[in-house]
Amino acid sequence: MKPPVFPISALIPQVLEVLRQHSRLVLEAPPGAGKTTQVPLALLDAPWLQGRKIILLEPRRVAARSAALFMARQLGEEVGGTVGYRIRFENKVSARTRIEVVTEGILTRMLQDDPMLETVGAILFDEFHERHLSGDLGLALALDVQAQLRDDLRLVVMSATLDGERLARFLDAPRLSSEGRSYPVAVSHFPARRDEALELQVRRAVQQALAEHPGDLLVFLPGQREIARVQAGLQESLDGSVEVLALHG
């Protein structure tokens, strides 16, 4: 499989050089730049890794599965080989796994079981701009391990929108920035009706968008309940040529 070219690809040599000389890195890259999948793969053969694992932390289970699947396909393998993932109630890793994509609670349990993280050479914190307790705790614990037990442990904080300069100062880490992909965007507003339920408004908006534009739609909703209601309504009102998928978790 020919490796895809991402905006982050041009920055990979600098990432490797920085991590050869430093144990920490702050990497800024917009959505779609390829940081989630291309950076872990690029680090696989780094001499300082010494055969240890790379842990990639994702804030959501869907993202963890998707990232692992994409990287495994790039290597021409199935998930659970060189690349695997671990999330709550689901484990797709093996003795051969070198890149583990995990949700943040998994890292906390790993530290409880192995405080020195002896089998881990690098931890990558993806989407760190989505600040929440689990991610902050994971970074704090990893910094503690690095400072007291494992000065060879590499920590990479990756973000799309967080103030990278401020974070780099806090971590005393080099900072790299990648270009992203640009697409033309047109903003329009759909008239809302105050007396109409959310799912009905979304249904009307989707029907209008499908009638006026080719391609796919991505609809953002507040929670799982709203997603289920909108999905049911769209499946009733749209013909069989439109597939309605619920994405959450």
Q: Over which residues does each language-model region extend?
A:
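P-loop NTPase motor module signature
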Residues: 1-249
